[in-house]
């Protein structure tokens, strides 16, 4: 009896939706293909994250640095821009990221430090010109999944040529899966 009730209710909903045009086939719409992206020399921009009161890096920031370092292995000609001010105990986010990169063997001459930004908007506003001054072909942005959407928008608003996004998973697993798919597709299609 319960099954019949559910089937009948489902049929009524479908009939109602069809009558209103809710189930009519959608008109195919195609976006123009994404313009070819130039990965010849991308800037890898790692966004900061608040430091501990003693000036040390929080786990999320260390993970962002490791993600950026991994990306940099694929682009040996590219600089890494570390961006973040918000000093704690005499250390800026960018300064701590630079130290970690150097400890892990990344060459100092490929690190550009932007240590004035106190927000994601400022990260974008201050890093986009640095990427352009370094003669890069665009930006690969590195942050965390829960921060990615806002960061992408801020960098686009600042005039950044966003080639791809990479994010370290954090937060809600559903968001992580969706963000991973976006990250994987971003070099090939416009996502956003």
Task: Give, region by region, the residue ranges found by the protein language model.
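Secretory targeting and sorting signals
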Residues: 1-30
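Non-catalytic accessory segments flanking enzymatic or RNA/DNA-binding domains
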Residues: 2-5, 131, 190-192
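General helical structural elements
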Residues: 6-10, 68, 186
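A structural signal for short, hydrophobic/glycine-enriched beta-strand patches
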Residues: 30-183
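Glycine-rich flexible loop motifs, especially short His-Gly-Gly/GGXG/HXGH segments used as catalytic or interaction
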Residues: 180-192
């Amino acid at each position: 009896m319960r099954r019949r009730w559910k089937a009948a209710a489902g049929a009524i909903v479908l009939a109602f939706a069809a009558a209103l045009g809710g189930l009519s086939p959608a008109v195919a719409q195609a976006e123009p293909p994404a313009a070819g992206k130039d990965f010849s020399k991308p800037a890898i921009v790692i966004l900061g994250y608040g430091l501990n009161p003693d000036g040390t890096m929080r786990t999320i920031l260390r993970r962002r640095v490791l993600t950026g370092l991994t990306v940099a292995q694929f682009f040996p000609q590219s600089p890494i821009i570390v961006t973040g001010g918000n000093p704690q105990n005499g250390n800026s986010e960018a300064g701590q990221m630079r130290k970690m990169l150097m400890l892990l063997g990344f060459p100092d001459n490929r690190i550009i430090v932007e240590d004035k930004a106190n927000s994601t908007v400022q990260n974008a506003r201050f890093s986009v010109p640095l990427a352009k001054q370094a003669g890069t072909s665009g930006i690969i942005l590195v942050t965390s999944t829960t921060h990615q959407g806002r960061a992408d928008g801020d960098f686009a608003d600042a005039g950044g040529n966003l080639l791809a996004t990479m994010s370290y998973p954090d937060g809600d697993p559903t968001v992580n899966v969706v963000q991973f798919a976006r990250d994987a597709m971003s070099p090939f299609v416009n996502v956003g």
